[in-house]
Amino acid sequence: QFWLRRARRLFPALYAVLLAVAVWAALAGTAEQQSQLRRDMVWSIFYVNNWGQILGDVPYFAGEAPLLRHLWSLAVEEQWYLLWPLVFVALLRIRAPRHVVGGAIIAGAFVVFAYMFWMHSRTPTPLGGPPAAFEGVDRTNFLYLSTITRAGGLLLGAGAAFLWRPWRWTHAPDAPVGRVLDPVGAAAVAMLGCAASVAVLTEGYVYQWLLPLVSILSLVAVMVAVHPAAVGFRRIMSWTPLVEMGKRSYGLYLWSWPIFVIVDATTGSVSNFVWAMILTVAVSEASYRYLETPV
């Protein structure tokens, strides 16, 4: 049932984007875009776009931007949706205490973070393997795009789900702890905004400590948001415009990048950027109302 619900939620909008991009590329795309699309389409259909970019040595931070470049993150997400339920069921059968299971999962997250640090500090670029499939792979591409290195943040959240259950500890919205949690949540969001604004994704510090820090800050924000006593932070996160944007965030993400590439809004043109934003919002709203919600 979980997999079926995920398919109903994710597949229709994704395949609509793939169809629209394919039609545009066939009619108006450059020869390079058409060539890239023939390669990327299959990877994207089966939610392995991230591995297609890694193994195909498609430079994520250089060269002409592929129309489907952004689908790497959805590939990581879907691979997690496929594998994690199986791991979760296996963990339940162990019958270990929740705090032991959660602690072990969080420890696994920090193993991944340590692996990222080691890989960036000690391994050559391009990579030399093993496995043989990674021979010649760009190190930065692998660190940024691979499911292996991105598993750290996912494991962090999964482990916390075993441990953090504040609604069982208190139901009092005026609990004194709220006076501590509200500024903690706000600080986490502010720091995430700063990280997104100043990070240069090709720099080593991103993989040595910034991505792990972003994962931890994101987890802190979520942990505060689900605590009954964090009334102020919960009220901000429940602000209607934010909620409505969140409902449409999947479509906004899917449509924004190809529209920005097609409108040529990635080159610094203000007018093109404005047109791309208007088109993205309009198409995403149509996708949400007439495709995502009905299904």
Give names to the regions the model predicted.
Residues 1-295:
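Membrane-interface helix/loop caps of multi-pass membrane proteins
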